[in-house]
Each structure stands twice: as structure tokens, then as C-alpha cells.
């Protein structure tokens, strides 16, 4: 931080330190990373969830889910209690340890959830299997987020709904600059999270039609309602 402040005082910019190719996330790295932090994951994100207000954003977005629901990269199951009562829910994640936590959360809330270990980039479901496909705070860690989004599109029914809550570049210049400067540090400290991505660009690149989108919490969290084209 001292070097950044010093550079700013001298009128110089501090260039971002990009993520080295050798440290790019792979499916195996992603699984191992989240297996290691599974039992502490909810503590690690407590501030974002409860102080910044991410819980409120989850609730508002997921209240729109209907029918047969797929939760992609469900993690420890934080979305589970937020779906409408009586929903038919399938939840998948690459990390078996995260799914163990999700199973405990399902028991806690008295819900019967179909849980499966699965790679978001290779969903093992037939085309058009779900009325609603959900993913929250996940595209920022997928090795190939566009491929994962294309898979979500594939398994969503043509008239279905895709609901996303994602990290992204802020529309506030000072904060966007901070995100860029600290891209690599954040990536290292937050399990491979690329917090300065452009979620809308990823969604559109995957051939998904955006119905509504909204920036939240200083423009860093994007709520997106979309459907397959």
C-alpha cells in the first residue's frame, strides 16, 4: 500500500500486476483450493455477506426462480434457504468438500436437495432440463467462464430464466482503478477470484440474452436476469 500511495503523490500511476499464466486457474486447482477452505468458507465471506449486503442481493434475485432449479457452483449452499418454498432444487459444485457443507445446510433448513459433484463447464444434464439456472459469485473463478455460461444456457429451457449475481468492474473510476491495481493480490487472497471482470460482456459472449441488469454495492456486484437466445 505504501508504494501505491507514494506513486500517487508523485503523480505516477501504479500499473496492475496481472495474473501470471502459470497461476491461471484450472479445474483441478479450483477443486483443490475450495476443498481446502470449505470448512472456513462462510467465515471468510461473512463481511461481504452481512456487512456489504450480499445476502440481501441473493434473496432479491433468487426470489425470481421458478420450477425446476439448477444452482451451478453452489458452494456451501448459501442459496439454499433463499429459493421459493417448495422449489425442486438440484445443486452442483466441483468441490466435494464444499458439497458436504451444502448437505449440512440442506439438513439445517429441512430441505431435500439433489447434490452432485460436477464441473460447471461440463454439466451432465440433457439440453433444456431446468426452468431456472442460477449461479452466484462464480464466473469470477471459472477457468473458462464463457464456456460455463454456455453450459448454463444449454441446460436451461428455451423459455427459462438464468439468474446471476457476479463480481465485476465497478463503474466508479477510482474503485475500478483500485480493482485493477490489486487484481493479482485479490486473486491470490480470494481463491482465484477475478474481481475486475465484466459480467455482462461474458454473458453476451455466451449467447445469452440479458433481460435486466443492475449494479450494486459501489457498482462491484452485478445482478443479472437473462434467458437463452
What are these model-predicted stretches?
Residues 20-65, 78-79, 101, 179-186:
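Conserved class I S-adenosyl-L-methionine
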Residues 28, 45-48, 163-221:
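C-terminal alpha-helical "lid/dimerization" subdomain adjacent to the S-adenosyl-L-methionine
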Residues 68-122:
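Class I SAM-dependent methyltransferase SAM/SAH-binding core
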Residues 121-133:
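A short acidic, Gly/Pro-enriched loop at the edge of an enzyme's catalytic core
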Residues 132-144:
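A short SAM/SAH-binding and catalytic strip from SAM-dependent methyltransferases
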Residues 146-161:
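A short glycine-rich, Lys/Arg-flanked "PGG" loop and its adjoining helix->strand segment in the class I
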Residues 223-229:
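C-terminal lobe and adjacent flexible extensions of AdoMet/dcAdoMet transferase-like proteins
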Amino acid at each position: 500500500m505504501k508504494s501505491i500511495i507514494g506513486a500517487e503523490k508523485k503523480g505516477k500511476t501504479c500499473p496492475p500486476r496481472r495474473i501470471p499464466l502459470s497461476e491461471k486457474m484450472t479445474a483441478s486447482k479450483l477443486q483443490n483450493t475450495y476443498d481446502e477452505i470449505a470448512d472456513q468458507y462462510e467465515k471468510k465471506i461473512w463481511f461481504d455477506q452481512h456487512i456489504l449486503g450480499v445476502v440481501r442481493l441473493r434473496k432479491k434475485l433468487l426470489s425470481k426462480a421458478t420450477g425446476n432449479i439448477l444452482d451451478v457452483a453452489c458452494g456451501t449452499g448459501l442459496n439454499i434457504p433463499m429459493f421459493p418454498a417448495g422449489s425442486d432444487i438440484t445443486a452442483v459444485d466441483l468441490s466435494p468438500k464444499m458439497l458436504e457443507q451444502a448437505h449440512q445446510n440442506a439438513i439445517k433448513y429441512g430441505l431435500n436437495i439433489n447434490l452432485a459433484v460436477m464441473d460447471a463447464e461440463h454439466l451432465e444434464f440433457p439440453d433444456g432440463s431446468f426452468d431456472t439456472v442460477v449461479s452466484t459469485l462464480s464466473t469470477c473463478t471459472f477457468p473458462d467462464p464463457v464456456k460455463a455460461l454456455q453450459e448454463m444456457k444449454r441446460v436451461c429451457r428455451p423459455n427459462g430464466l438464468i439468474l446471476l449475481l457476479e463480481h465485476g468492474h465497478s463503474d466508479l473510476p477510482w474503485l475500478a482503478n483500485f480493482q485493477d491495481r490489486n487484481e493479482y493480490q485479490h486473486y491470490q487472497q480470494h481463491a482465484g477470484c477475478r474481481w475486475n471482470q465484466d459480467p455482462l460482456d461474458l454473458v453476451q459472449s455466451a449467447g445469452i440474452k440479458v433481460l435486466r441488469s443492475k449494479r450494486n454495492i459501489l457498482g462491484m456486484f452485478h445482478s443479472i436476469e437473462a434467458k437463452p437466445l
